[in-house]
Regions:
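Surface-exposed, charge/polar-rich loops and edge strands
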Residues: 1-197
Length: 197
């Protein structure tokens, strides 16, 4: 590929974020950045992190919530039934792995912000069931049949009814909880994707 600029610079100049039908006009690229963003590499915004602000993170810390960082380069969400999600690049640093292990050791809960975080943490488990520092591409597909080993809860947006991420939600919360949540979302006409409810 021969382009006149470095790839990231070229994409920043000419690329456009994925936009869904309910978005009336294009948003600036900055609207797609979460407070967690540190380096370029995602194909889509990790949308579960979008509602978080620096103020909210400070409030969570003051209330005793510990935050752990990792690197995620989200892929494009799969909308086709039975189509597996694309591989995604992740890095779980040693400090994060240690914090996850310490949280579980004291009986605490690990709550992931987004499905990509779940895939990253679950891909970083050793044979003994402990989270370790790791990085690479994950092609992990989590379903109710594939037991969750690390994550105790998940903050996420609404996923298309046939998306593979819906199976992950069922693995974490159970089919009945997800069915009730989606019934309410449809009844109240919640929005989906990056700027949804």
């Amino acid at each position: 590929l021969d382009i006149p600029l470095p790839p990231i610079e070229y994409l920043q100049r000419w690329g456009r974020p994925i936009a869904y039908d309910y978005i009336p006009k294009p948003f600036p690229l900055s609207a797609y950045q979460t407070v967690f963003a540190r380096s370029a590499g995602s194909a889509e915004m990790p949308s579960a992190g979008r509602p978080f602000t620096r103020s909210l993170l400070a409030c969570l810390r003051r209330s005793g919530v510990q935050l752990a960082r990792l690197v995620l380069h989200t892929g494009v969400a799969s909308l086709e039934q039975h189509e597996e999600p694309y591989e995604e690049w992740y890095e779980v640093p040693l400090r994060t792995a240690e914090l996850v292990r310490a949280t579980h050791a004291r009986g605490g809960r690990v709550i992931a912000v987004g499905t990509t975080v779940v895939r990253a943490l679950e891909s970083s488990v050793d044979a003994a069931g402990n989270v370790i520092a790791s990085r690479g591409w994950t092609d992990l597909v989590i379903t109710p049949e594939r037991r969750i080993r690390v994550v105790d809860g998940l903050l996420t947006g609404l996923h298309e009814p046939k998306a593979t991420h819906l199976a992950m939600l069922e693995a974490i919360a159970g089919r009945n909880v997800i069915a009730r949540a989606y019934a309410e979302a449809l009844d109240r006409e919640y929005l989906w994707h990056e700027f949804g409810d």
